């Protein structure tokens, strides 16, 4: 008679194979994670050219998230572009980010130092928690080339944490608008962001999101209401 594995032993044997496979997969994924984190040249690489928008990405050794840089030109004025960046209404936020649902002034516009700090809350697709952004926006005009550089930096500790939401702790994004004449602006955008999603998802999706933002930029900034913005530091440097 053939030796047969008792029925009770078959599940145990399957479990051993399953457990061994899980351990091997965990080791493989851990190795891949650390290999990815250690990789990178720190050099910018062109990853997308579309309808006048150039998008570059950079992978730094020691970081799992890529950073992004984009360049384009738009028909607009410096006053409109800067006015749009100073618009802190929830309505304006929702035009830039469809999930934006609320906002709060943390520090009002500082005319002398040219900055403000504002809070925005954005809904996220289920099952992710809403995202909270506490941002300092710093405006720096350049008297030589008439450009304006705007730096957005996360300030996560400016308000107490909310249990409802994920507070974004890493954001170092910037815009630079340089007048070219004939009603054109040169636009440079930089994104360094951790939105609290898996890095492999973010790195895959980010170029498309950056492009969408640049493609929508003329519509977002070319609003009549921004023609009436009184921006004193523009008058002082132009």
Language model features with spans:
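Eukaryotic helix-grip
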Residues: 2-238
């Amino acid at each position: 008679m053939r030796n047969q594995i008792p029925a009770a032993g078959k599940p145990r044997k399957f479990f051993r194979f399953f457990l061994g496979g899980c351990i091997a997969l965990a080791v493989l994924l851990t190795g891949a994670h650390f290999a990815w984190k250690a990789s990178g040249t720190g050099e910018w690489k062109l990853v997308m050219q579309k309808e006048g928008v150039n998008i570059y990405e950079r992978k730094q050794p020691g970081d799992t998230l890529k950073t992004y840089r984009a360049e384009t030109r738009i028909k607009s004025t410096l006053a409109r572009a800067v006015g749009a960046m100073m618009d802190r209404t929830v309505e304006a936020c929702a035009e830039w980010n469809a999930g934006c649902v609320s906002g709060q002034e943390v520090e009002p516009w500082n005319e002398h130092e040219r900055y403000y700090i504002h809070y925005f809350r954005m809904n996220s697709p289920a099952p992710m928690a809403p995202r909270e952004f506490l941002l300092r926006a710093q405006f720096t005009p350049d008297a030589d080339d008439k450009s304006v550089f705007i730096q957005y930096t996360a300030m996560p500790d400016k308000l107490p944490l909310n249990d409802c939401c994920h507070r974004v702790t890493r954001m170092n994004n910037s815009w630079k608008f340089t007048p070219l004449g004939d009603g054109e602006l040169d636009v440079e955008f930089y994104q360094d962001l951790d939105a609290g999603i898996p890095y492999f998802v973010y790195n895959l999706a980010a170029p498309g999101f950056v492009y969408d933002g640049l493609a929508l930029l003329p519509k977002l900034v070319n609003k009549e209401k921004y023609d009436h913005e009184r921006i004193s530091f523009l008058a002082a440097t132009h």
